[in-house]
Amino acid sequence: MQRQRDYTMNITDILTIIENGENSLIVHIDDRPVQNAGIESLDLEKVKSFFLKVYDIDLKEVNQTEKDRILINSCILIPVNSDLFLTMAGILFFGEKKEVLYSSLEQYFPHAGIQFVVYANEDLEPIFDRYECFEPYPEAIDSIVHKIHLNWKTPSKIKGMKREEVSFPEKLFRELVVNAVTHRDYSIHSKIQIRMFSGRIEIITPGWLVNSVTIEKMKAGISIPRNPLIIKYMQNFRYSDQLGRGIPMILRKVREMPGYEIEFKEDEDRFLAILHLPQKKRDLF
């Protein structure tokens, strides 16, 4: 039996609704500060590269006051009292990736990581492969898709006198992972889980569908963004088009893959995308 949704709001959420009206019942938190993640947790080189490439702004040529103003207006940083902290979106995209010890994301926002596991069977044991990803976006998406590819057994088909391998559906998995990281509920303290079995691959995203959105509406391209700032940065990095076409694109790609099926469902406080694999793919596992 499914649990009832928890609509508990804090005082900030209530004040937002009073100020902005009923549309604010969708409470966005991706512009809020991450506790203890100060400006020293920022990957300044990535920030500079981003602004130069996307906005043609050279941060090397502006003073510190102007630089802070730009980062605050971009919702990468947020002032709290007399200090600057990374926002949730700021640490997700521009958190420092350290060579040793923890990355900024793992240190200050660990439940935003992505867990990838390959299981031998339905008993969840033994585990063939396991990977915890705490890279910033969008690099984390590339790393997870790469791990799926490494564990992907490629079937082949005979065409004429030649054996041709069926290519790995990289764009499909990229779209599935992008959909998960942009629409998950970051207030829930659990990671996105990607579980690989012989007959299916599950992408488990923390959080209910937003408000009146249903699975059928999603299939029709109707969506309400839970994390508009994250979606905006995904768009800037060319990983999303912000047009609500993610699920329709996924459905179209799956229809182009004979023997594959995709299933979407809500399970308690999680959203699941389950890619069912054809028998010839299962036999290779």
Question: Model segments located where?
Answer:
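Conserved N-terminal catalytic/coupling substructures associated with nucleotide/phosphate chemistry
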Residues: 1-284
